[in-house]
């Protein structure tokens, strides 16, 4: 052992390479006085929707909140109580947490050698309302005809930039955690979908139910600084 220390992340090196650009745009946002819900947020959401070949994108505080938004929305769309969601055995705990917090019963399915849900091991004797697909380490989730008639939700925190950003789910949760594919220097997430009702639900959820207050929500907005970065 020669005492060599290898950094766990390369965030410092990345920041040093982008420092001038990051500081310039951060200063621009702060000098504008528009710290939330401004042009950078709108531009980033528009870019995300186009990048993912989807109609809509809504930013939020984190990938975990993006999953919660999706889970709560689809729980309200079903008469089954509690609805059941199947998630892969290999995923971060936030995937399960989001659905449990939203009132779902979570069933765990074993994975294949790539860490993705193995359709051969899916529970056939259960009534399932949603399948949650997770692509780990940048590996795209598999587009299988098995999913064609079911509610499919993608936890895209680690894989959304793969497979040319083609989405196969009804909705996808994205994360911009500093350790993710596209990172912010803080927290951030987004919901990507073609569902206009989900878009409106997400916008209300992230802003304490405003403006109609027909649904409850919380403060889960992504700041202008993080969107600009």
Task: Briefly describe each language-model feature range.
Residues 1-34:
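N-terminal "arm"/small-domain region of PLP-dependent enzymes with the aminotransferase-like
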Residues 34, 38-84, 97-102, 108:
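Phosphate-binding glycine-rich loop
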Residues 5, 17, 53, 76, ...:
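Pyridoxal 5′-phosphate
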